[in-house]
Amino acid sequence: MAEMDLVAELPRPAGAARWAEVMARFAARLGEQGRRVVLITSGGTKVPLEARAVRFLDNFSSGRRGAASAEVFLAAGYGVLFLYRARSAFPYAHRFPPQAWLSALRPSGPAQSGKLSLEAEENALPGFAAALQSYQEAAAAGTFLAVEFTTLADYLHLLQAAALALSPLGSSAMFYLAAAVSDFYIPVSEMPEHKIHSSGGPLQITMKMVPKMLSPLVKDWAPKAFVVSFKLETDPDIIISRARNALEVYQHQVVVANILESIKSFVIIVTKDSETELLLSEEEVAKGLVIEEKIVDDLRSRHTAFICDKN
């Protein structure tokens, strides 16, 4: 299978074996508690153009959807395994950019016994205390685990390890595949070892297609899980047909279809026999609601029905 061949071909990231063990323990512990667990992939991958990489082809994604969704899943009682691009949006923290902290936080007095006390006006960081409390509660309960990736190789190896970790949970596991994964890569055997120099003239690169990992995930890695993929298009006339084609090819449960211009306020939940539009009203936007709340609420109901059907 081309997908498995690619995972084997790409270099395994440092620490992958340790992370595989950590993820397996995380999933097993939450499974023993009878808790549902969702793997959220978030952010974009990048592929190196040289073996000693200086240049990369990067799939940009802020990771905001994945981070916001993680918060909603945690509030709903799920365990969350958050596989995310380093320095992309992180649950709770993404609402508060570092420059806001620098402006709002003040030392409240001299440091004593190695502790630094900080204070801020509440209106300078609205919602910060609640976000901090929610994150720390999830961390203390052991229901949140974050794992970083950077390159395509990192992502594929860690995705496989995460899927194998969640597989024993059966239908109680959900995969929420929101990462922007590279479509092209340069095989290791065809990659120049050293930095590509501009003195060689215009650059011509031949890249190979990255096989979709939905196929081995659904068929081999976690065949009993509830799997959700995402489809982003700029043409609303083709979005449903593209989503349905993905469902037919990969035989998973749900595609969340997005149109670029309305990605923050409108999605279509597509299954093999239904299309459900989710829209944020102007009033909901004014209240600070986010579309991820509606997405997760819808998927939770579908996941419940999926579990009942399997049992």
Swiss-Prot record:
Pathway: Cofactor biosynthesis; coenzyme A biosynthesis; CoA from (R)-pantothenate: step 2/5
Gene3D superfamilies, per the entry: CoaB-like
Record-linked Pfam families: DFP
UniProt entry keywords in alphabetical sequence: Acetylation, ATP-binding, Ligase, Nucleotide-binding
EC number from the UniProt entry: 6.3.2.51
Any single biological process term in GO: acetyl-CoA biosynthetic process
InterPro entries: CoaB-like_sf, DNA/pantothenate-metab_flavo_C
Source species, domain of life: Eukaryota
Keyword field contains Ribosomal protein: no
GO molecular function ontology, one term from the record: protein homodimerization activity
Coiled coil segments of this chain: none
Modified residues (N-acetylalanine): 2
Protein family membership: Belongs to the PPC synthetase family.
Function: Catalyzes the second step in the biosynthesis of coenzyme A from vitamin B5, where cysteine is conjugated to 4'-phosphopantothenate to form 4-phosphopantothenoylcysteine. Has a preference for ATP over CTP as a cosubstrate.
Record note on quaternary structure: Homodimer.
Protein name per Swiss-Prot or TrEMBL: Phosphopantothenate--cysteine ligase
Gene that produces this protein: Ppcs
